[in-house]
């Protein structure tokens, strides 16, 4: 499974929301993510992709859409 598909699956599993048709929509504004959900998402991303998401690198504006999450995970996996 590629990173994009897996990120979509993680979001759907955690938040019961299919974001495949809203990849560029702000997930906070859409009510999908909130502060607690962000923590859950980070933990799951770290576990599934064997990455570490430094808090200093997790800015809401940098990780607020599914596409940005995919980009962030891709960058961290390639680091």
UniProtKB/Swiss-Prot annotation:
Q: Which residues carry this modification: O-(pantetheine 4'-phosphoryl)serine?
A: 35
Cite the PROSITE patterns for this sequence: CARRIER (PS50075)
Instruction: State the signal peptide span.
Output: none
Identify the Pfam families for this entry: PP-binding
Q: Its pathway?
A: Cell wall biogenesis; lipoteichoic acid biosynthesis
| Gene3D superfamilies documented for this protein | ACP-like (1.10.1200.10)
UniProt GO cellular component terms? cytoplasm
What GO terms are given for molecular function? Answer: D-alanyl carrier activity
The UniProt keywords, alphabetically, are: Cell wall biogenesis/degradation, Cytoplasm, Phosphopantetheine, Phosphoprotein
Lineage: superkingdom: Bacteria
**Gene Ontology annotations of biological process type:** cell wall organization; lipoteichoic acid biosynthetic process
Subcellular location(s) per record: Cytoplasm
Processing after translation: 4'-phosphopantetheine is transferred from CoA to a specific serine of apo-DCP.
HAMAP family reported in the protein's UniProt record? DltC
Family of the protein in this entry: Belongs to the DltC family.
Can you name this protein?
D-alanyl carrier protein
Q: Which organism encodes this protein?
A: Streptococcus sanguinis (strain SK36)
Gene that specifies this protein: dltC
């Amino acid at each position: 499974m590629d990173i994009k598909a897996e990120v979509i699956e993680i979001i759907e599993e955690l938040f019961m929301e299919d974001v495949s048709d809203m990849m560029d929509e702000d997930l906070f504004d859409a009510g999908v993510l909130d502060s607690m959900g962000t923590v859950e998402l980070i933990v799951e991303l770290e576990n599934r992709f064997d990455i570490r998401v430094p808090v200093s690198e997790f800015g809401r504006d940098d990780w607020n859409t599914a596409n940005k999450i995919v980009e962030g995970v891709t960058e961290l996996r390639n680091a």
